[in-house]
């Protein structure tokens, strides 16, 4: 019964998708515009390029429906540990990890039962072959010395350049982890090399999801489970502006819009950073059309002063994601621990032991994480101890919950996710098409003189918008100056108070150094929390003020435009942008970690030292001071020197923080304002273009106008049917989802 219902729903989804494709083809043929020299060169929502994108979206949904494939898009920055997270989800290493961007092209990772060894299919390799030929010629002509100035040439890049010079093409098929790593690393290095040699990488050739590389492998966490109708596939997406390629943002947006669900990987230590903000904006742009989930990676770096899991969920759900995701869909995890633990358990189950660390480097990482930094090779021979350590590391990784709640659920309900994705895409398409066509149909019924008047009124609104933007900039600048002046005054107060507390603390030179360290850490943590709370409230208030100022300026223009259109008989349905908060969030916990000027930590041992502990260690020339079994320094410690040095570092930190505040607030607000006004102006320009096209069509002979009216009315009606049927489809799918939970 369940299978029959799925089949009927998939047939209905396919019917609606095919009907939508037919309607798009009709739209392409309709004479809805009259070309002229004064036509603005804009990427309008229903221009030919946009219609082509909608065709691609519908074709992609048809492809997923035919397979009943649920595509879970995974997005995150390089530093968030996206590749490690995917490896942890799959249960084995299918993506390479390097300390540089590794996803220049989207990559599909498809769960294939029985496929123990990963295999990569790269059928659409022809554009890469053409690129290699271009690069081959450029390498012959270029100055290698100049190339080294603009490109880091490591051994991988050197091998790729040699391969290009020899004319070695990419294969269409790679079997095994190492050949796959080599292929993916070479593709990403190819992007960097092409940029350095000023050759365009063929990103557009891989816009269609069927053209991107596909890795097929059995997901370890799904091995042995009963089979379900449907297929689960992960989509590794390029991060925003990855590898210095800002146009990857468009590719990312396209891939996210075509996914069945989106999983964002955020960095616990960088939750309020600019890079993670770009990821959040990308997934928020998808809206409510697909389910959203968040993995907060690197949660193993939490300490007693950091936000706990519930606080992280509340921060992301309420503040960072603006209520678009519930706390239940947010999972703090350690992807590295999860990957290492599961890899070790898998090796023990299949081979009875772990490989030698010299043969597979991940074993050393596992031992360090599970056994501690003092592990020995002999420890790996105690299989019962290793098995217990792997289980504990898996438990500590917190990965079991998202595996159960997300991966298992996605696998069991892949067909329903695919159908729900199609239903939501159909609803969005039909709604947008109906609003656009209804506007165009009504435009043919409005008198030419009235259309001219509407065009003139929109032109006046555009001019008023430009005038108001110049005027409001001064007011906003004044508000920013007031906020920064107040923030700097508060920062100086905290600086003075902290230095006074430090001076009082160091007066007692009889206190043991370990107790002094603890009290210093407490003082710094208290100051951090005070500044964090104040800045959160202070800049939330600034954000509200900016929104109010802009709303007061924009609302009269918006209301006037809508009223004038309504008087001409145009129905509401034209959406203007809404100004969102643009004041950056400041992670004072991270900033305070830099209060003491520290050496760049090169290993995990260094990063685990506390701020004050590391400072004392450096001053006493004892790198491991402050750990267990610490030894008291033999030399006399001059507390006055420590106090002066610590106070100097606090002063420097406060100065730097004030500078960062000014730069980031000004940059963020200016960019946000410019974007908002540009989007608002673009909406008005689009409206003006539609009205001009309606006027041009209205001026055609009466028989042509009547024919277009009939065509538009029929098309509007058809899209209304598509919308209604898509609503019914969505409701039926939701009923099945609800039934699956009980």
From Swiss-Prot:
GO cellular component: cytoplasm
Predominant cellular place of this UniProt entry's protein: cytoplasm
Annotated localization: Cytoplasm
Annotated stretches, region: G3 motif: 236-239
Region (G1 motif): 76-83
Region span, G5 motif: 331-334
Region (Clamp-binding consensus): 41-45
Family annotation (NCBIfam families): PRK09866.1
PANTHER family, per database record: GTPASE DER (PTHR43834:SF6)
Name of the protein in its database record: Clamp-binding protein CrfC
Species whose genome carries this gene: Escherichia coli
């Amino acid at each position: 019964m369940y299978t029959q219902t799925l089949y009927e729903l998939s047939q209905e989804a396919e019917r609606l998708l095919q009907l939508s494709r037919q309607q798009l083809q009709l739209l392409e043929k309709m004479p809805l515009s009259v070309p002229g020299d004064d036509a603005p060169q804009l990427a309008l929502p229903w221009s030919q390029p946009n219609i082509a994108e909608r065709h691609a979206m519908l074709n992609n949904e048809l492809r997923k429906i035919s397979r009943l494939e649920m595509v879970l898009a995974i997005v995150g920055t390089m530093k968030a540990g996206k590749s490690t997270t995917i490896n942890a989800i799959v249960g084995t290493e299918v993506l390479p990890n390097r300390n540089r961007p590794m996803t220049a092209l989207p990559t599909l990772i498809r769960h294939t039962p029985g496929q123990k060894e990963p295999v990569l299919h790269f059928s659409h390799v022809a554009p890469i072959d053409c690129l290699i030929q271009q690069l081959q010629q450029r390498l012959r002509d270029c100055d290698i010395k100049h190339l080294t100035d603009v490109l880091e040439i490591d051994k991988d890049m050197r091998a790729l350049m040699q391969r290009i010079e020899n004319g070695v093409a990419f294969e269409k098929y790679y079997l095994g982890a190492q050949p796959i790593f080599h292929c993916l690393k070479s593709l990403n290095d190819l992007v960097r090399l092409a940029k350095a040699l000023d050759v365009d990488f063929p990103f557009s050739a891989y816009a269609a999801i069927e053209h991107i590389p596909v890795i097929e492998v059995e997901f370890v966490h799904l091995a042995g489970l009963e089979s379900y109708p449907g297929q689960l596939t992960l989509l590794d997406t390029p991060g925003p502006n990855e590898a210095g390629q800002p146009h990857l943002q468009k590719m990312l947006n396209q891939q996210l819009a075509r996914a069945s669900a989106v999983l964002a990987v955020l960095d616990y230590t960088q939750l309020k950073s600019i890079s993670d903000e770009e990821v959040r904006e990308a997934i928020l742009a998808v809206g409510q059309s697909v389910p959203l989930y968040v993995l907060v990676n690197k949660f193993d770096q939490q300490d007693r002063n950091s936000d706990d899991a519930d606080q992280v969920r509340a921060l992301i759900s309420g503040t960072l994601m603006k209520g678009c995701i519930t706390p239940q869909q947010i999972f703090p995890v350690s992807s590295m621990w999860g990957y290492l633990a599961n890899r070790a358990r898998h090796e023990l189950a299949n081979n009875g032991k772990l490989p030698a660390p010299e043969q597979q480097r991940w074993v050393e990482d596992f031992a360090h994480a599970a056994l501690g930094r003092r592990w020995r090779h002999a420890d790996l021979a105690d299989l019962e101890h290793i098995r217990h350590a792997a289980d504990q590391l898996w438990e500590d990784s917190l990965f079991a919950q998202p595996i159960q709640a997300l991966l298992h659920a996605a696998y069991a309900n892949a067909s329903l996710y695919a159908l729900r994705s199609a239903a939501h895409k159909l609803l969005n398409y039909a709604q947008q098409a109906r609003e656009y066509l209804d506007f165009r149909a009504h435009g043919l019924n409005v008198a030419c003189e009235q259309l001219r008047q509407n065009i003139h009124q929109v032109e006046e609104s555009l001019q008023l918008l430009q005038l108001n933007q110049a005027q409001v900039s001064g007011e906003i600048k004044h508000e920013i100056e007031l906020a920064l002046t107040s923030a700097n005054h508060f920062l100086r107060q905290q600086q003075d108070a902290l230095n006074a507390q430090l001076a009082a603390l160091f007066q007692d030179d009889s206190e043991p150094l370990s107790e002094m360290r603890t009290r210093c850490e407490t003082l710094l943590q208290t100051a951090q929390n005070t500044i964090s709370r104040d800045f959160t409230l202070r800049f939330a208030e600034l954000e509200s003020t900016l929104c109010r100022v802009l709303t007061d300026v924009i609302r009269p223009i918006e209301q006037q435009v809508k009223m004038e259109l309504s008087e001409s008989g145009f129905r509401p349905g034209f959406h203007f942008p809404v100004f969102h908060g643009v004041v950056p969030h400041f992670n004072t916990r991270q900033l305070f970690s830099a209060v003491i000027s520290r050496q760049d930590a090169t290993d995990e041992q260094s990063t685990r030292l506390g701020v004050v502990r590391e400072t004392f260690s450096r001053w006493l020339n004892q790198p491991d001071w402050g750990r267990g079994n610490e030894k008291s320094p033999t030399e006399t410690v001059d507390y006055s020197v420590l106090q002066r040095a610590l106070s100097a570092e606090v002063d420097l930190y406060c100065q730097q923080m004030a500078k960062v505040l000014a730069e980031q607030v000004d940059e963020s607000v200016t960019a946000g304002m410019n974007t908002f006004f540009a989007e608002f102006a673009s909406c008005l320009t689009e409206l003006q273009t539609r009205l001009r096209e309606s006027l041009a069509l209205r001026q055609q002979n009466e028989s042509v106008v009547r024919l277009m009216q009939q065509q538009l009315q029929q098309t509007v009606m058809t899209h209304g049917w598509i919308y209604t049927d898509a609503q019914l489809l969505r409701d039926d799918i939701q009923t099945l989802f609800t039934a699956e939970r009980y």
